[in-house]
C-alpha cells in the first residue's frame, strides 16, 4: 500500500516512512508526487531492492526448511527496520512463538474436527 508524506515523498508502505521507522533505519523513498515514482537513481535502487525480496532472499535455511514456514507471516518493512536498513534481513526472534501458535491451532482444529464429524 503506497504512502505519501506531507512533503509529497512516496513510500512503498506507511511502515517505510520516517515516522514509523524512527531512528532505526533510513526511510525508503521510491519517488514523489511532483516527479513520479523512480525518477532518480536512488529511488530506482530502492525499487529494485524491494522487487528482489522474497521468502528465499529474506530467510535462512532454518526458516526455509521449517515445517511451519509456509504459514509464517512477515513484514518487509519491519524486517528492514529491525536490521537497520537491510531489505534482505528477516527478524526471527518470534519464530518459537509463531510455531507454538501454529501447532496449537492445528491441535485444536483437529480436535474440533474429530468431535464434529
Indicate where each model-derived feature is located.
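A C-terminal junction/extension of Radical SAM enzymes
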Residues: 1-19
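Local cysteine-cluster metal-coordination motifs and their immediate loop/turn environment
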Residues: 12-15, 59-79, 97
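Short Fe-S-cluster ligation motifs
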Residues: 90-117
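C-terminal accessory region of radical SAM enzymes
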Residues: 16-65
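Short cysteine/histidine-rich zinc-coordinating motifs and their immediately flanking basic loops
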Residues: 75-88, 106-110
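Glycine-centered flexibility sites
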Residues: 8, 31, 74-75
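Active-site lining segments that contact anionic ligands and/or coordinate catalytic metals
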Residues: 1, 5-7, 25, 58-63, ...
